[in-house]
């Protein structure tokens, strides 16, 4: 409370306020979480004199110490305490020359804290159940406490007879469906707590089977073969009378001990001795054990074997999970635990249930578990970036009683250095990281069980940076010398590695006479050859990370040009250059005109021959196709096949094709190359079976089906067939076009296999494909329905080329193309667990996948989420290495198998199943919430835009795909803010600290500042290793 003396002082100081002194900054009221820091700012101006500042707390002058101190005119409070620091703060500015004082308006400090929650019963009767969630905590002046109610593990909301009123839960007309354990959670800025002990509500079963009996009818003796309907009065609360009590000679002699305390890991048993009279041995009697009101185990006493880890009843209030530690002994009713774990703590009660009678229960027994002292998780060593503002090392311990955590530094002086402190949760905090913080630190956890410790190594590093980056492109002539600079700084000293076309260079695999690797990282190439042309990359790295820069080397061959004559004058040289240029231009024009005329003549002759051939093959039944010149000009989206072969392979058209290869028609060569590639991908439509439509995509329907195992070839088989066909084409026709096709195809395969995986990993994938040759392959089939839509056909071909060029276990395989008739089918690899988004929703409990006797899959752990993200990064890196872009990367377009293998795919169900995630922009359906700004503004898709989408995918993974990115905004708002550059992104709450910085860099507006997939893969690999420790 503010004392009278403090009020008088404040009034006196306000009365002597100098007119020349005014506050520029006044302290503001604040709400802060307990144990965090707070700062009150205060600044006043006086043009002529020096000012002195002081602070009052609740009217009393503050006694400064290490925790509460004044820096300049500002007041700093470290580790705020709610018992001492709550109240009003006033800043006093004193003019030392005149003695005039000025007092600021009071600023209120509120402390946010949260300790515990408990469920209190306010009233219970037949018409209403009233519960209250009592919370020990405060939220200050911020948002009020958020209260959530749970029945068993189900979250409650206002619906039907359930009403949520602030801290209270009201259930009107409660019935048997409202039975269960009620708990509440409270959350604010300080954290989230759940009530340790809830309230168990169990409505009394009120049904007495009174059936009218006729003289000539008898009751069925076997209860399990007859069903009776018991109805109560209409309009009554329950409408049924209570069940009769069991006979007195059926009773529980001894129940569990009222309270037992067991150490974690030790065995124990809960007693339930009962007496069963002989006349009831043939009746159906069940022995049940309940934990916290939920059914845990039960067994029939009428002759059936004991049920271990299984039950006939699998209702929503049951805890009947598979657990070999728990055994229910039928003979004496004892429930034994092979070894106690922390989750076994609770209230236990045994029951006997005679059919058509009310159950009898033992007195409840409380089982308390003394949890072993341990670290959860184990503290790990960490690299801290030099000059980082804040860095944290976590140390969390569990045990009974709650352990105390402290940190010491190894060495002679165990005290922590300056700017290093420990918060209330045991986290070691480094502020303004410097080299003195380097060393070994030990975390000590202590309670009555003893003490445990864990030592971590803290290393202060500097991220590698280019001091002299490689600059290009570099042009040089053959036989010349080229120098490519690459110098780096960092701590530890970075290593420098050069590569050419993604193949590492070293003294062992290069010509030492021509290639020199200097100590400062510079690469010098002497006597440059034509084969030295390519893309050179310099990678620098240390324990703090990796960086890479590329430079292009262009080698110009020496021609047979005219050597300049020293004796001639400048005018002669200019005249000769002009004459040569005009002569070459004239010759080029004549050549082009002649080729155009000749190509036109040859094209007309080829069309006439092809029309004659098609007429003969059709038996003369297609005169229009043969005779109509316009019809032959139009080409389909993808050329169709006849009897499994393309028309271009017919014997009669071989001469035309051969003659056309000598022409300079770029379009003709491209179309023949595409037809040749599509011919290699041909699959018979009869090989597909059990097609089930799962949705519609941008160019047609999408199905899931099965493909005959005999039609599934390994990637190595496809390569061999391709080379064989190219060789035959080359030997048979002698055309230059087929040779270029072979060379380009082999180069594409080399590029697709040069990724983060080495050749051994590709061999392992091929071996796995051979092992599965005896089974039917699950496939995804995409139909091309919009044959006349040029944009749809172009996208269909792009996806074909993308998936055909990639041979990586992180990307689905393209098995082939069915072109026998419309619609064309693209056949892709599929998995038994389907698309990744549905899997995430199932593990989050948003999709009901539980069957009878089973439960929903548990949520993914952080290690599992990191493993999924890592596999997607590897697959996208393979796409980047093959010089392709995905353009629609999301969890809905990835698939996962039961072996937890994730692959990048392309279902793109944008028309129905995932239509909510697409928006029509500029007459095109786009996944705008996953697209980079340059894609929406300029329709520019690059690998950097795929990296932007990958950051959103990781956000989806850590949110279990339960919500859309920026779901609070409409699609139009997302487009507007993305184009304006005001769309703000933040990582998911569950993201590890080591990944936050690199994931945020995926969403920067400048694409050049975004990381590469290899950098993301390295960061994820390091995070996975940390999570496993």
Swiss-Prot record:
Region listing for Disordered, in residue ranges: 613-675, 714-756
Modified residues (Phosphoserine): 674
Superkingdom of source: Eukaryota
Cytoplasmic side: 599-1029
Keywords (A to Z) from UniProt: Cell adhesion, Cell membrane, Disulfide bond, Glycoprotein, Immunoglobulin domain, Membrane, Neurogenesis, Phosphoprotein, Receptor, Repeat, Signal, Transmembrane, Transmembrane helix
A GO BP entry: photoreceptor cell axon guidance
SUPFAM superfamilies reported for this sequence: Immunoglobulin, Protein kinase-like (PK-like)
Description of how the protein assembles with itself and partners: Interacts with plexA; component of a receptor complex that mediates the repulsive signaling in response to Semaphorin ligands.
Name of the featured protein: Tyrosine-protein kinase-like otk
Organism: Drosophila simulans
Gene: otk
């Amino acid at each position: 409370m503010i004392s009278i003396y403090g009020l008088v002082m404040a009034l006196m100081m306000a009365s002597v306020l100098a007119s020349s002194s005014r506050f520029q900054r006044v302290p503001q009221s604040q709400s802060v979480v307990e144990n965090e820091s707070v700062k009150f700012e205060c600044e006043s101006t006086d043009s002529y004199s020096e000012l002195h500042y002081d602070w009052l707390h609740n009217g009393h002058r503050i006694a400064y110490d290490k925790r509460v101190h004044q820096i300049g005119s500002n007041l700093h409070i470290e580790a705020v305490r709610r018992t001492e620091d709550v109240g009003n703060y006033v800043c006093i500015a004193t003019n030392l020359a005149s003695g005039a004082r000025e007092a600021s308006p009071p600023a209120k400090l509120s402390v946010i804290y949260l300790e515990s929650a408990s469920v209190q019963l306010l009233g219970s009767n037949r018409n209403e159940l009233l519960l209250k969630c009592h919370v020990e905590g405060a939220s200050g002046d911020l948002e009020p406490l958020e209260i959530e109610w749970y029945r068993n593990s189900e979250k409650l909301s206002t619906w039907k007879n359930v009403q949520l009123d602030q801290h209270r839960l009201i259930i009107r007309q409660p019935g048997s469906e409202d039975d269960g354990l009620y708990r509440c959670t409270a959350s604010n800025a300080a954290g989230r707590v759940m009530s340790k002990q809830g309230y168990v509500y169990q409505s009394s079963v009120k049904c007495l089977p009174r059936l009218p009996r006729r003289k000539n009818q008898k009751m069925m003796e076997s209860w399990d073969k007859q069903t009776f309907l018991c109805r109560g009065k209409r309009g009554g609360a329950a409408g049924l009378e209570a069940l009769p009590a069991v006979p007195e000679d059926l009773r529980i002699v001894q129940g569990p001990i009222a309270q037992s305390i067991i150490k974690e890991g030790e065995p124990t048993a809960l007693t339930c001795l009962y007496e069963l009279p002989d006349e009831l041995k043939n009746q159906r009697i069940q022995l049940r054990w309940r934990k916290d009101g939920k059914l845990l185990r039960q067994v029939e006493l009428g002759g059936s074997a004991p049920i271990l880890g299984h039950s006939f009843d699998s209702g929503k209030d049951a805890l009947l999970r598979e657990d070999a530690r728990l055994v229910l002994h039928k003979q004496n009713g004892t429930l034994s635990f092979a070894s106690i774990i922390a989750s076994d703590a609770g209230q236990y009660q045994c029951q006997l249930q005679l059919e058509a009678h009310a159950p009898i229960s033992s007195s409840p027994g409380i089982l308390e578990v003394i949890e072993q002292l341990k670290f959860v998780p184990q503290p790990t060593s960490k690299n801290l970036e030099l000059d980082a503002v804040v860095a944290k090392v976590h140390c969390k311990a569990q045990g009974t009683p709650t352990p105390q955590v402290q940190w010491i530094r190894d060495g002679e002086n165990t005290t922590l250095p300056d700017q290093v402190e420990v918060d209330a949760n045991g986290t070691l905090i480094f502020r303004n990281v410097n080299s003195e913080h380097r060393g070994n630190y030990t975390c000590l956890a202590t309670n009555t069980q003893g003490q445990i410790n864990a030592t971590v190594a803290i290393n202060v590093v500097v991220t590698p940076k280019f001091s002299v980056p490689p600059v290009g492109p570099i042009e040089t002539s053959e036989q010349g010398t080229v120098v490519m600079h690459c110098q780096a700084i960092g701590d530890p000293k970075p290593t420098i590695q050069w590569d050419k076309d993604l193949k590492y260079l070293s003294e062992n695999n290069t010509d030492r006479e021509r290639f020199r690797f200097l100590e400062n990282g510079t690469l010098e190439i002497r006597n440059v050859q034509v084969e030295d042309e390519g893309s050179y990359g310099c990678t620098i790295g240390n324990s703090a990370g990796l960086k890479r820069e590329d430079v292009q080397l262009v080698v110009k061959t020496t021609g047979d040009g005219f050597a300049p004559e020293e004796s001639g004058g400048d005018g002669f040289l200019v005249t000769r250059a002009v004459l040569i240029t005009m002569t070459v231009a004239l010759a080029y024009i004549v050549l082009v005109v002649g080729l155009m005329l000749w190509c036109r003549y040859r094209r007309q002759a080829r069309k006439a021959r092809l029309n004659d051939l098609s007429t003969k093959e059709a038996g003369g039944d297609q005169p229009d196709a043969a005779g109509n010149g316009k019809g032959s000009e139009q080409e389909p989206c993808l050329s169709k096949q006849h009897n499994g072969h393309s028309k271009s392979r017919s014997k009669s058209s071989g001469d035309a094709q051969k003659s056309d290869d000598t022409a300079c028609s770029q379009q003709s060569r491209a179309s023949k190359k595409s037809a040749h590639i599509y011919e290699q991908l041909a699959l018979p439509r009869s090989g597909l079976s059990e097609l089930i439509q799962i949705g519609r995509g941008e160019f047609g329907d999408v199905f899931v089906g099965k493909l005959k195992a005999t039609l599934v070839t390994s990637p190595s088989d496809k390569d061999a067939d391709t080379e064989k066909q190219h060789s035959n084409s080359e030997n048979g026709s002698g055309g230059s076009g087929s040779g270029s096709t072979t060379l380009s195809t082999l180069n594409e395969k080399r590029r697709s296999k040069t990724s983060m995986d080495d050749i051994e990993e590709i061999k392992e994938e091929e071996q796995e494909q051979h092992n599965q040759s005896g089974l039917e392959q699950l496939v995804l089939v995409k139909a091309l329905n919009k044959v006349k839509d040029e944009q749809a056909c172009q996208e269909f071909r792009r996806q074909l080329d993308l998936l055909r060029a990639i041979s990586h276990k992180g990307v689905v395989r393209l098995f082939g193309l069915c072109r026998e008739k419309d619609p064309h089918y693209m056949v892709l690899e599929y998995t038994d667990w389907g698309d990744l988004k549905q899997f995430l929703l199932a593990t989050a409990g948003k999709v009901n996948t539980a069957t009878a006797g089973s439960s929903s899959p548990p949520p993914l752990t952080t290690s599992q989420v990191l493993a999924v993200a890592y596999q997607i990064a590897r697959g996208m890196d393979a796409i980047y290495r093959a010089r392709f872009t995905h353009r629609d990367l999301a969890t809905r377009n990835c698939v996962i198998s039961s072996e937890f293998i994730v692959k990048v795919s392309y279902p793109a169900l944008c028309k129905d199943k995932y239509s909510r995630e697409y928006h029509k922009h500029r007459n095109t359906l786009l996944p705008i919430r996953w697209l980079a700004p340059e894609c929406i503004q300029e329709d520019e898709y690059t690998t950097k835009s795929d990296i932007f989408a990958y950051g959103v995918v990781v956000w989806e993974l850590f949110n279990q795909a339960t919500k859309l990115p920026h779901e609070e905004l409409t699609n139009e708002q997302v487009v507007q803010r993305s184009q304006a550059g005001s769309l703000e992104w933040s990582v998911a709450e569950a993201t590890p600290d080591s990944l936050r910085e690199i994931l945020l860099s995926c969403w920067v507006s400048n694409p050049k500042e975004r990381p590469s997939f290899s950098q993301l893969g390295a960061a994820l690999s390091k995070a996975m290793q940390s999570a496993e420790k």
